[in-house]
Amino acid sequence: MEKNDMMNDEDIKEFHDLDKLKDPYKPLPHGLVIADSQINGQGLFTTRRLVRGTHLGESHYRFDGKLVRTPLGGFINHSNEPNCVRSQVRVKPHYDKWTITIIEDIEEGEELTLKYTMYDPEKI
């Protein structure tokens, strides 16, 4: 694909198989809400218990160098003792996504957090 070309339907399908999704656009995963945070502004909070290893979804996408942030990526706050980790996945050349995974059990009402610097892959 040339840099100035638009993505076609096949590129989109290959990037993220929309046919497998019941609802292709879900702003936040089930069990998460945006609420006022004591850390900074607003943050992501649980409405139910979530266990270590739960994959929450994509926080960011990069298409041909342009970064797109999802609500999941836009509202998760920083902590030096995070309960989530973000991982980069190369989907295909020029297309990356970042996913968020829980690294410790989180009780209902707790805020989700990431460490905005480098992550330790051993904690996943």
Residue ranges, per PLM feature:
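Conserved catalytic SET/PR domain of SAM-dependent protein methyltransferases, capturing the structural core
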Residues: 1-124
